[in-house]
Amino acid sequence: VKVVNQPLRKKDAMQLVTGQPVYVDDVTPRDCLCVKLLRSPHANAIVKSINKTAAMKVPGMEAIFTWEDVDQDGRRYTQAGQTYPEASPYDRLVIDRHVRFVGDVVAILAGADEKCVDKAMKLVKVEYEVLEPVLDFHTAKDNPVLVHPEDNWESLAPVGADNRRNLCAHDECGNGDIDAVLADCDVVIDRVYHTQACQQAMMETFRTYCEIDTYGRLHIISSTQIVFHTRRIVANALHIPKSKVRVTKPRIGGGFGAKQTAGSAVYPAFVTWMTKKPSKIIFSRVESQIASSPRHEMEMHVRLGANKDGIVRGIDLHTLSNTGAYGEHGPTTVGLSGHKSIPLYGKAEAFRFTSDVVYTNHMSAGAYRGYGATQGLFAVESAVNELANILGMDPFKIREMNITHEGEIMPAYYGQLNTSCALDRCLARVHDMIDWDNKYPCRDMGNGKIRAVGMGMAMQGSGITSMDVGSATLKVNDEGFYTLLIGAADMGTGCDTTLAQIAAEVLECPLDNITTLSADTDWSPYDSGSYASSTTYVTGKATEKCALELRGKICALGAKLLGCDKEQVSFDGREVRVEEGENAGKTINLSDIATASMNGNSIELQATVTHSSEISPPPYMVGAAEIEVDTETGEVTLLDYAAAVDCGTPINPNLTRVQAEGGIAQGIGMTLTESVTYDDRGYPMENSLFQYKIPARVDIGKIRVEFENSYEGEGPFGAKSIGEVVINTPLPAISDAIRNAVGKRFYELPITPEKIAMAALEKK
């Protein structure tokens, strides 16, 4: 390989670091309607009346839309970016008379500028009938208070949903007789773990610009991971034909799953469609904190059984998930809590995985990197660490005895074959990187501080089997350079670069010879979007196949121009050469072939390929943390984090490494500081980055990432995914290190200094 597995610079790097205008607010007009949302101060209420008379008298105000402008009996929609028919229920209206959380939309205001809209918003008078909210997700199921009592609530997929029970989803699956196996085990770990809701906290908040184009269609320019899904979502919300909607995306200032939900597009789309005037919405940081789509709060009851020799024989997991006021991604995230944690332990004779996803009057949850696997892995990996403690075994050793291996069937992973796996090598690599034998479990530093280590494993997937679709179009232009058209959305991950690397490898050309254009529903080939760790594996494979097809067409036209058969020529990326026959040795360069294709030619130098996969090969990761705990204050200092990742072949080692480092940093925040909490009225407490504590550079210590490459035969050049698996190991690793330092295991995140200090006092 010459281009793949090379640490090449991102194509857009210079534009980003020099501050060029590349984001939504940079590339869209300022002289458009400013759109803002009046939001509910109540967790559960009915809007009795809205008086907008005074507000509309403010100079510059264009329109104020309320529930009276939306058919309350019309078909509902979901904002979840998922393939149709979505697993997420259709439970939203653009503006609903029934508001279901603090921050839900009461009115859409549009005016000439932000100043007049802000003034008008203060003059809108709303009368509410305040209802009792459901705030505790433990009591939501079959609660007499219904979050969605409406008759036009709809579930399109068989996910066990029932709005009359506050159930967004329910599922049960298993293999073997788990109760009999657990009854026969020498040791059973029976614990309940709780993970909090967390914000993605991307730098660029939700934002969308809308206009009516030359053909009278709605053109949406949005910071989104899902242009094709957004087209469907907006069409469903506005009850207009999809042919009337075009969605494009510029650069994205971070997404991490938040922008797999169309959280902002619907509202300016509604304004522009109604007024026929361009409009723009930019969420404030407060709005992105109180009305976005954070990680699902989950509670996991784990029963893990083993023999006294450390062999894990059975895992029983029940997950309760809080989807909040609306069901975006609720039915799908919960599945990963079991199906991306239990399969790590290949020796288990039986498993059972059950789940409930419930509605509450909290902010609607959504997609966040890790997508449910993060929560489940914290629970299962913590249980395995506790098992090691009880048996007096080394946590690395107990995993070496139990892990899945290449070539094994994984019953808890939908019965899929483990086609590529370097998990054993990842374990050995991290064991040495962290110097485990000399540091485990802890060392008293003699100054009131204790240093300790902990570890954990993780897996994820590479796209959604038999569902995700990736496509690529490649064409040859004048002078022989290429254009790569994709529907995947580069949200900082670098897929515009890595997909071009795959094409360049096949076409044997420098990376700069390929121009990447992405994510426009009018001219991009269809792509499900950038989520579910699918882009490299699914769209990357489409790109590889597309480049191979185009290469064949180049050879065919070159052979025609050279007067021989296609089978007689070769192509080295620069020229087509006749290898045999009477014209052997004759050549024609790519530039001349490209020029000839534009004059009297019937062989199109363009190819489009679509790809979907029947398997989703997991990437694997092992992580180990070294921390220092101040036993008096409870402060945790992360000294070192060592990780080894099996993502198959890294297409671009630089981008792969920073993906891993960023994911680890987010996992550190979830473990130690980040949390979405509410007061007893359902009001969110962390409405800014002062209250919501994401880790700064000084908080994450030294992060070291290395790679143990397997080779996935179904992936492009052996590649699997990288984007999500990297967030999962800090939770069990750091929490286990804290246990080793202070002698108490914490079952609820985040583990704050206050919790540790209180535990130390209780111990004394």
Task: Label each residue range with its predicted role.
Residues G74-Q79, A120-L123, S222, R231-I233, ...:
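Short acidic, glycine/serine/threonine-rich loops at helix termini
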